[in-house]
Amino acid sequence: MVNETRTQAEPIAVIGVGSIFPGRGGNTGYWRDIFQGRDTLTETPASHWLLDDYYDANPLTPDRTYGRRGGFISPVPFDPLAFGIPPNALQQTDSAQLLALIAAKHALDDIESTSGVEIDRTRTSVMLGVASATELTAHMAGRLQRPVWVNALRQSGLGEADVQAIVKRMEDHYIEWKESTFPGLLGNVVAGRIANRLDLGGSNFVTDAACASSLSALQIALHELRAGDSDTVLAGGVDALNDILMYMCFSKTPALSPTGDCRPFSMDADGTMLGEGVGILALRRLSDAERDGNRIHA
């Protein structure tokens, strides 16, 4: 009975793709990197964190990571006005939300450019695998350490004027709390912002199943389509969290590869590697896609 049910399950088609990955980036570049067997893992760029500050080959060194390589997304141009986002809110918005917004638009554009058919956005949902933590969350938590800094400086014998001046300089390394900070750091708003800015009227939410988050989101999307609750679903995964916190977490477990290479299914495998990336698929029921003349990628 179970096998019969699986056989009769409505086939689902991929009709659009949007992606941002390390290396050559988008859909075409990502495929070329795979086809050519290109290694897109690199040393940690200074834009993320400095090796001099945090790297140590000894895994037992406190507050240091033995990982120095990973997959890092290159800077991506973002026009906030094109998405109706105030430019002065960008600092208070996590990069995962912005990158996902770009990739989602690419997926929708892919549908319209390849089939010339606009989907019904009122019945389009967004379901993404997203980690509960965001880079901005850690950043804003750091700003709240002011009392710790003040106490440490006072205990060092500094005068109050010097204490306050030094703490002010430390605070200047963190962005200020504003009205847009809370939604800007929430993981669930990765999906919510896509629905809001791209005018999608279906469900929107994220799922956190650790390393299986993307597959979890896809599974839920299939159920959504087969139940008839949505006609189109944007599903996939978003991870822009290659900050030092993640490296420290995986180093102290320890789960990171000490040799700096990911070798799945190999006898020489010695750990995992961390990589940023955004991959979003536009999914429809196969019968609907064929009826409406959508280009079917898979």
PLM features: residue spans?
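Condensing-enzyme catalytic core of the thiolase-fold
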Residues: 2-298
